[in-house]
Amino acid sequence: MSSISIIRLQDRPELKDSLARWFHEKWGVPLEAYQESMEDCLTARSAVPQWIAALEEDRIVGRLGVIENDFHNRKDLTPNVCAVYVEEDKRCQGIAGEMLRFICRDMYARGVGTLYLLTDHTSFYERYGWTYFCMVQGDGEDSLSRMYRHVETEFPEKAVPPILK
């Protein structure tokens, strides 16, 4: 079994187009929106947006992003972790948890200690230090969704990409 590494898009900019296409196909958000956000990640000096991926050799097996707002009415709850996804054949191996830990530490190193996440899952994110914060109205949604918050309280020596074995 090969190991899984967590990488920043900034460290592997050649993955931009394949990541943008994948996110577009998975979530239905226009391809151009992902391309623009990822280009901003690569060229802007601000902490947001950010995009990471979990790689098994050259195969992308997990991904997530950090954006200002994940399509909800609480514009004050920012930035948001979005589009957390691990390929089905790689689930239950700790990859999502490692990606979440990595992005929380990486954002803390960039000066952002508090992150928000919109989800309908009721117990998954608590395992990784996220706490339920409030209910929010998703854009175009009839029902409310759960907003979680994560506050990074410790700064590790280095926010280095973890390797899973």
Label each PLM-derived region with a short phrase.
Residues 1-17, 151-165:
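Conserved N-terminal entry element of GNAT/NAT acetyltransferase domains
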Residues 24, 28-56, 61:
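Active-site rim helix/loop that mediates acceptor-substrate recognition in acyltransferases
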Residues 49, 76, 81, 142:
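Short coil/loop residues immediately preceding or within conserved phosphate-binding loops
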Residues 53, 59-69, 80, 85:
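Conserved beta-strand in the GNAT
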Residues 69-71, 89, 122:
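Short coil/turn motifs at secondary-structure junctions
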Residues 90, 94-102, 112:
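Conserved acetyl-CoA pyrophosphate-binding loop and the N-cap/start of the following alpha-helix
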Residues 109, 113, 119-143:
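Conserved active-site alpha-helix within GNAT-family acetyltransferase domains
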